[in-house]
């Protein structure tokens, strides 16, 4: 039978500490409910003594969570432990997590105590917490830089006092995997009463080792991993939940352990945390990055189309994503282009693959990424006849003050003919410009994504706007680049509308062929 590893999520405690702005109670509850659906065993949701706001959010979450243990942090201080209990007592099941520093550096410089005093404080804290609950976790902070004899001594004392989980954190991300695994193995072998508690690990990512250290610890006997969604946390972050969970799942042959996590929820929770915390996910982040399942090399794409297992060790569906993306770029091969056309329902007889692939490479060199509707336009519209953009932005001005709604004046050229209009209202100048453009074109368009990135430094920086719009159930992309954000936003919308016009033209050509 495989052993189970307890997943202790600390997104709302250690993760939240890293944010520039605190989350509201409502946002924290939203994340907590998502973590409950994800299937975490324990969620650490705050440090109640630190502020009234933290106390209230811990209490609110404790009241709503039914299928996970709710934990709160406290120093080895009576008032902290009492506050943690007061906030948690409404929960179905709760844990008090108390900690004290154990490394010589912390003990002498921060606590200004002897190690004997520290052991005494740890024992008193665990005993006090045990008065409130039989689920008490004890952490020796900065264990990674504490001598092994001292770790074993304080852990043994904490277990004797009633700790049911003992956490050996690498607080500053200092350890390397073999070294950390060795610490866990020694705790397991040298602490006489270790069978009465679960060994937990809490790793930071300062040297990029958090995932590796946590997995090595499990191989050496740890049975709880403390982690956060997307690896958010102080400095370089914490162990990433999605990475350790998927590593244990994909390499169960090697690890021999599993978790209670419903991996289908990973993508959804990852996106929610990223948005609510305003913490973008790096595109090449393992498991949840936007490129994690995207293949753009021609050789890889050809292999993927023949057999997914050639370059994919886990399927995107396991984390709740629909399908891997084969990005069409200048590096894509004919197989990927043909595959995209087949996905849209076209047989090889419907178009000339050689001609399409040549045109595709020209466009990809110019544009970077090519979308499905671009392929259709290349396949069915004769580019030699000069496929100019039907819509061009001619003139633009927008004005906005605090007192009055935003106004915009827009002049477009549609098929060479000038059209102009003014619009009032909207949530600012960009909105006013969009209203004006949509009024002029008469298209029904819904905005589903808007992203602004600065290209370059300082006042000379260009603002690039990337948008995704929906028209008749289909998504179209637009990009605009200008020194002025309103102008780059307008250019992005015009770009997307030109893609829509091309799609209309393709549809007309197809209808004409059928009649």
Swiss-Prot record:
Record pathway: Amino-acid biosynthesis; L-leucine biosynthesis; L-leucine from 3-methyl-2-oxobutanoate: step 1/4
Gene: leuA
Catalysed reaction equations from the record: 3-methyl-2-oxobutanoate + acetyl-CoA + H2O = (2S)-2-isopropylmalate + CoA + H(+)
Assembly behavior: Homodimer.
Names of the cofactor(s): Mn(2+)
Domain of life (superkingdom): Bacteria
Compartments where found: Cytoplasm
Family from the record: Belongs to the alpha-IPM synthase/homocitrate synthase family. LeuA type 1 subfamily.
SMART domains reported in the protein's UniProt record: LeuA_dimer (SM00917)
Ranges of residues in domain Pyruvate carboxyltransferase: 5-267
The enzyme's E.C. designation: 2.3.3.13
Descriptive protein name: 2-isopropylmalate synthase
Function: Catalyzes the condensation of the acetyl group of acetyl-CoA with 3-methyl-2-oxobutanoate (2-ketoisovalerate) to form 3-carboxy-3-hydroxy-4-methylpentanoate (2-isopropylmalate).
GO CC field: cytosol
PANTHER family: 2-ISOPROPYLMALATE SYNTHASE 1, CHLOROPLASTIC-RELATED, HOMOCITRATE SYNTHASE-RELATED
Amino acids binding Mn(2+): 14, 202, 204, 238
Span list, region Regulatory domain: 392-515
Alphabetical UniProt keywords: Amino-acid biosynthesis, Branched-chain amino acid biosynthesis, Cytoplasm, Leucine biosynthesis, Manganese, Metal-binding, Transferase
Keyword hit for DNA-binding: no
Coiled-coil residue spans: none
HAMAP family for this protein: LeuA_type1
Listed PROSITE patterns: AIPM_HOMOCIT_SYNTH_1, AIPM_HOMOCIT_SYNTH_2, PYR_CT
CDD domains (UniProt xref): DRE_TIM_IPMS
GO biological process, one term: L-leucine biosynthetic process
